[in-house]
Structures are given as structure tokens and as C-alpha cells.
Amino acid sequence: MTYFEELINTKPKQPSTMVASISSKVLQIRKENIKLSLSDLNTVDHRQEYIATVDGVMYYDDSRAENVNATWFTFQNIVKPVVWIAGGDDSMADFKDLKKVVRQKVRAMVCVGEGNAKLKKAFHKDITELYEVENMDEAVNLASLLAQDNDIVLFSPACKSAKGETYTERGNQFTETVKRMEHERHQ
């Protein structure tokens, strides 16, 4: 019997049964619509975007986080230890608001590119494993060596690119390097 047939065949002396039936059907329809709506939501590219899990390590691209506040908010959503890839033109950044969360969550840090003097100085006492590399390939490869099972490798630069690249270009470099590494390790 369909929902509408059930309504038509309901006797007047059963109003509470009818209300209960209608309510449960409406709630079920709402639940299904909510599930469908949520499943259609896509993440915003380069904003806390999951890329892959390689050898038990999860890789996330947060290249849109080109300032301290954006990176801080990303760290608020993370509960696992992090190998943090950051860097760029740090001349305008003030990293003091990140220090506490970095001490709590970051296992190691990889500074990528040029212009990271202020970034390294800000965290050299908080992170025992702090490295500097020249490009994204080196950053991802080093981060994969530093990461342990169930860690997160997070690319969240906390500053603009020193080379004038967009966050999209840097995020794509990160994603391509991770995907290439994933492919090589699973052949």
C-alpha cells in the first residue's frame, strides 16, 4: 500500500495513528533528502582537501591557507600527529598565534621554497625536527619519511608564495607529487 493509499484508507477514529504514520514518513523523507544533499557536497579545492593515504599516512592539501589564521583553523580540525609542510614569503606573517597549536600537534616541519627565515625562527624551539627544502617534490618525499603510521602530512603554507605562484599552483604541485608517490609505491 502506498503512502497516499494509506491516507485514503485511514478511518477517522484512528487520527493518532494517521498522524504518527504521516510524521514518520515525513521524517524519513527529510532524512533521505539530507543524506542526498550532504553526499553531493564537495570539498573546496585546496582547503583541507584529502588527497590520499599512502603507507598509512594521510595527505591533505590546505594550500588556500596562505595566512596564519587559516592554518590555525585547519589545525583545530586535526587530532592526529602532523608533519607540516609550510613556507613562502613569511615577511608579513606573525606566527605567535600558531605556536601553542604547533607544539601540541606537529611532529616535524618541512619548510619549502625561499623566504622561510622568519618561519624557521618562529618554530625552531617548538619543533625538534625542522627541515628546509627547495621544492614540493623534496618536501613531500621528506615528509613521507618523517611521518609515522596514522600521521597526517599537511601542506598548509601559512604565507603567500615567495615566487608569486597562486595557491592553486602550489596545491596542484603538492597533489601531483602525492599522487605520483602513491602510484609508485603501489605498483
Language-model features: locations:
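Short, conserved micro-motifs enriched in small and acidic residues
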Residues: T10-P15, A65
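A short glycine-threonine-serine/GTX helix/turn-capping micro-motif
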Residues: T2-P12
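Local beta-strand/beta-hairpin segments that build beta-sheet-rich folds
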Residues: M1-T2, I51
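ATP-dependent carboxylate-amine ligase
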Residues: I22-R30, L36, D40-H46, Y50-Q187
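Internal alpha/beta core interface subdomains
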Residues: P15-S23
